[in-house]
Amino acid sequence: MNASFLPPQAGPLLTRHLKMGGANPAGIRLDLTNRYLTRAGQPFLPVMGEFHFSRCEAEAWPAELAKMKAGGVTIAATYLFWIHHEEIEGARRFTGNLDIRRFVLDCGRAGLAVVLRIGPWAHGECRNGGFPDWLVRKGIPLRCNDPAYLALVRGWYAAVFAQVQGLLYKDGGPVIGVQLENELVDDAAHLATLKQIAVEAGFDVPYYTVTGWNAAAGARIPADEVLPVFSAYPDAPWAAGTAPLPLSPHYVFDAERNDAAVGADLMARTAPDGWQLPYDRYPFATCELGCGQQSTYHRRVRISPMDAYALSLVKLGSGNNLIGYYMYHGGTNPVGRLSTMQESRATGYPNDYPILNYDFDTALSEYGEARPQYGLLNLLHLFAADFG
C-alpha cells in the first residue's frame, strides 16, 4: 500500500495580530506570527521540557537543569501547584523545595528560559488538580468568574508574582511566558479574566498560553489574547479500562493539532453549537508531548524510547513549531502536612496514581537517570536548532 501526506495549504502570513510579545532590556523582542515564534524578528523553534521544581530536591535543581540543557531543551516549564504552597489557608510557603525564585534563577544560570504554569487549577496528577483542600471545602464555584473565587485567585497570582518579580524577560530575566489554567475547554471569558488578573499582578511577559485541546473542536479561548498549545501521548493511562487502545493517530503525519483523548476523563465530548478553534490564527505549538507516561493503578503502561522519538518527530514534520514535552524530567510527590499530594479517586478524581512516584517513565527519571529517549530526542533537538 502506498500512502502520501498532503500538507495543509498555508494561508496568508499574519503578524502582530496577537496581543502578545515583548522585548528585554537589550531590545531583543519575542513575538509570534500565525505560523511560528520569532526572536529579534527571525523565526525560531524552541524546545520546552516540563520539570516540576516542587517534586525535586532544591539542591538537585542545578544539575538536573544542566542535563535538560545538554539534552537540547531551551525552555523549562513548571507548574506551581497551589496546594504545595498554601496547604493551610494563609500560610504560604516559598522556601526549600518550594522556592520558585531560586528555581527560576537556577534556570537562568543554566541558560534556560522559563514558562510558569501558574494555575490556579493545574491537574498534573496532583491532589484536587492542585487546589488546596481548604479552597475546595469553601463550597464556592471554582474555575469560573465567581467573585469569591476570583478574589482568592488574585491573592494566589499576586503571591506567585512577588516571588519572581524582577525575573521576567522585560527585566532581563528568564521568564518568557505564563500558562493560565489547564484543560479549561469551554470558558473563554474566564481565561480572559485570568489573563487580566495575571497582568494586573505584574506578569507582563511575551507569551500567554492556554491548553487548546478539547474532545470536540478545540478549546474556547479568548480570541487573539493567548496562544493555544497542544498535546499528544503514546498511551492513555487515564482510560477507564485495561484493553488495548485503538491505533494512535499521532504516529501519522497530518495537520491535526487537537488531541481528543487527553483529558477525556474530565472533559465533555461535544461542542453542540458548532464551535471551532480558529487554528489558522495561531502557530502550531505543543506543551505536552509525552516522552513518557505516568501509570495509573489500573493501567500501568511502559513507553519505549522510539514511542517518544517517533511521536515528537511526526509532530515536528506535521508543523509543530514549539516542541514541548510533559514530562521531560520526572519527580517525587511531596507529602503534605495534612495529606498526601497525589490525584486519587478518594478526592473525587477518576484515577488513582502512586502516592510518591511521579517518574513518568520519561527522558530524565525521578532521580535524574538519562533514559534512551533522552539521547534519541536530543538528535531531533539538534536538528531543530540547526534547521528550525
Which residue ranges define each predicted feature?
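Hydrophobic faces of well-ordered beta-strands that scaffold small-molecule active sites
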Residues: 47-49, 76-78, 114-118, 176-180, ...
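Substrate-binding cleft/loops of secretory-pathway carbohydrate-active enzymes
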Residues: 183-203, 211-254, 331-339
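Aromatic-lined substrate-binding rim segments of carbohydrate-active enzymes
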Residues: 61-128, 133, 195-200
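Carbohydrate-binding surfaces of carbohydrate-active enzymes
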Residues: 3-12, 138, 149-167, 171-179, ...
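Glycoside hydrolase catalytic-domain groove-lining segments
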Residues: 219-297, 353, 364
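Aromatic- and acidic-residue-enriched segments that line the glycan-binding/catalytic groove
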Residues: 90-98, 109, 120-144, 158, ...
